Amino acid sequence: MASPRAAVVLASMPDHPDAHGQLSPDTGGTVAVIVVDHGTRRAEANAGFESFVRASADRLPYPIVEPAHMELAEPSIASAFDRCVAAGATTIAIAPYFLGPGNHWDRDIPALAEAAAAGHSGIRWLVAAPLGPDPRLLDLVEIRLAHCLAHVDGRADECSACAGTGRCILR
């Protein structure tokens, strides 16, 4: 079995043949994914994240995909972990919805996952790499900036993130 560090390295290499949701045949089991963000007291922000995770479940090659918030809101990592196990997961990959490695990725999320796993004997888990640094994020930054600048210039509607907020204005 690969170490958690090896699994983190594979998760940071999206073009690696072993990084596409499959465990080796001798490992077996059902893989679940928990996508975790920081969490906020703003209900609409949490709802937007949870909607994103539900939509991503249709694209990800895993039978179980759950949202979780690290703090400040439910579902927590512990409750998402419980739901994954109840749905039949034997391995849980926790995907941080964070741009870079920091204390949350290095310490907080692993500690919360360890506590959640304590009640589930035989369940394996890992915390995957954060989203960046990944050069594909530059494409997203470029697209977002171009759209926002086109909007304030009157050439495009507001993007879905800003729609109705009154925030996408040139001051």
What are these regions (language model features)?
Residues 1-171:
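Active-site-proximal alpha-helix that buttresses catalytic centers in soluble enzyme cores
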